[in-house]
Amino acid sequence: MMEPHPGVFVSNVRAEEWEPDPEVPGSEMHELVHAGGVWAGLTRFTTVEGPVPWTPSQRETIHVLEGEVTIASAGGPALTLKPGGLASLPAGLETIWHITPPFTELWVLA
């Protein structure tokens, strides 16, 4: 990640720039920005060992780039997203993600 001008963040996703995601075991992430209350980047799964529980700390908007995910939450309908699919989840929503790898998403927490 580079900041060529104050507040402007630029990145190029190369294989060596993926790192383990500390909040989601079994996945890798590439961070674009983590500043001013916004956190954005990419997450990818090449394998998945069962459902992934996830509760966003802020509103999370996702865009599926590869693979498929079904997101279940208590009291709500399950959402199935494929490449091109977008969803925005409120902060604190307890979800279970059923991921079909390979899976890659662009996410923004704000």
Model-derived features with residue positions:
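A short, N-terminal "cap"/entry segment at the start of jelly-roll beta-barrel domains
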Residues: M1-L42
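Conserved short histidine dyad/triad with adjacent acidic residue
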Residues: G36-P56, P90-A91
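Short, conserved beta-strand element in jelly-roll/cupin
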Residues: P56-I71
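A generic structural motif
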Residues: A72-A74, H98
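Short acidic-glycine-tyrosine-enriched beta hairpin
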Residues: G75-A91
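Ligand-binding loop in jelly-roll beta-barrel domains
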Residues: A91-A110
